Amino acid sequence: MQGTKIRLLTGGLLMIAAASYVQADTLQPDPAWQQGTLANGFQWQVLATPQRPSDRIEIRLSVNTGSLTENSQQSGFSHFIPRLALTQSGSLQAVQVRSLWQQGIDPKRPLPPAVVSYDYTMFNLSLPNNRNDLLKESLTWLGDTAGKVAITPDTVNYALSNSDMVATWPADTKDSWWRYRLKGSTLLGHDPAEPVKQPVDIEQIKSFYQKWYTPDAMTLIVVGNVDSRSVIEQIGKAFGDLKGKRDVPAPVPTLSPLRPEPVSIMTDAVRQDRLALMWDTPWQPIRESAALLRYWRADLAREALFWHVQQTLSKNNAKDIGIGFDCRVLFQRAQCAINVESPSDKLNANLSVVAKELAKVRKNGLSKEEFDALVAQKSLELQKLFATYARTDTDVLISQRIRSLQNQVVDIAPEQYQKLRQDFLNSLTVEMINQDLRQQLSQDMALVLLQPKGEPEFNMKDLQATWNEIMTPDAAPAAQPAVDDLHQDASDIPRTQ
């Protein structure tokens, strides 16, 4: 669920001190999104996009259950239920369902038909435009999946004999870095990729399905050039008769704070050494204008830092070094990293180069010229907001919506975004940005080195000593970071360079 250019109508943060000058107005949801709740608690959201008549119609059914709801006897249930559902036709004919799935996956940007994570299960359909018959069949099939999956010895055996089409988030739950990040968290014992134990206990699967697949824990999202009134009526027919109600809420997944000690991790995910200078803070929702402005400010400071370091390396003709920034929200933790890619034999020297530049920015801040150029660039982007929005594909729009829902961020209308953003840019000063930069660069950062498997393990003590010598020569206590200074994929900073 990462990445687009207008990431979108939730982009950055202003400092705590400035918050007192901002009236904490509640952000108003974008009225273009129609939403409602059926009598049984089932929620739906529809965005009609007449400006994108040729785009595919994107449909997502999110169920608030995942591997975290399993006990030890139920391990693998959350993954197996969508696998079971994908082998069934429900109230449709088998030939209809085959045709639906043949056309229900975008050939250019294919998504797995179902994804299971720790706290959600998502069913994904992407339909050709102007195919109301497929849209109706999709809603019917999803309605059957939401409450009418047949769980019998025959259907279970049939599902087990077919290939598993269900993906997980993250895609590789066994990844070395991911397992390290989960240390100290309840998520560690609840792998969404865990296969169901055999022989399968039919009654236990039924009980799990009835307990967690309840309409009051489901949200359907539809984005595309559709007749909203007709779609909403079809949603009522497909999902209105679902039964069940949650007795207990699903557990909320949380990560422990990032461990401060340096670590080297062997992984197949990189081809050369990648050192992440990483920090994280508790994530706070964005429901009021003051929180949005606080976010924008810290986000802009990070972007300024990225471009400053990149340009400095370019001016100095730095060789064998790549720089990138990555910010995201992971289960109630807001996490950022400055990534340094380097050959192993030059890693310590390259860390020294980057650390010296970070220390210089922390001490001196940005120049007025750099600040003015950044604000001018952001103002120019803002002028193109509506054109950018009009070019945003439906699959991007629905992905942004899902991220906003997961991170409790209010999606606001482009008009409100433009006004708030312009006021923010007009009120910003170089002193504000530099104060935020000093704050961010005074935090404790963990050194996390990803190394290709088979490479000799790097001595992390050497890297930590280099870092400490430059960044903490007096071992001064680290400043406390702002609690809500970043939001997943709401940054304009490129992920890698």
Mark where each language-model region is.
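M16/MPP (pitrilysin/insulinase) zinc-metallopeptidase core fold and M16-derived inactive scaffolds
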Residues: 58-126, 172, 187-191, 303-332
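Extracytoplasmic
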Residues: 28-33, 39-42, 52-62, 72-77, ...
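Structured mid-domain segments that build the active-site/substrate or prosthetic-cofactor binding neighborhood
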Residues: 291-368
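Proteolytic maturation boundary segments
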Residues: 8, 20-47, 227-268, 273-282, ...
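Acidic/histidine-enriched segments that form metal/cofactor-coordinating
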Residues: 98-208, 277, 352-356, 363-398
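Gram-negative bacterial Sec-dependent N-terminal signal peptides
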Residues: 1-23
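Second-shell loop/turn segments in exported
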Residues: 46, 64-71, 81-89, 121-132, ...
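Non-catalytic, conformational "gating/processing" segments within enzyme and secreted inhibitor domains
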Residues: 202-237, 444-446
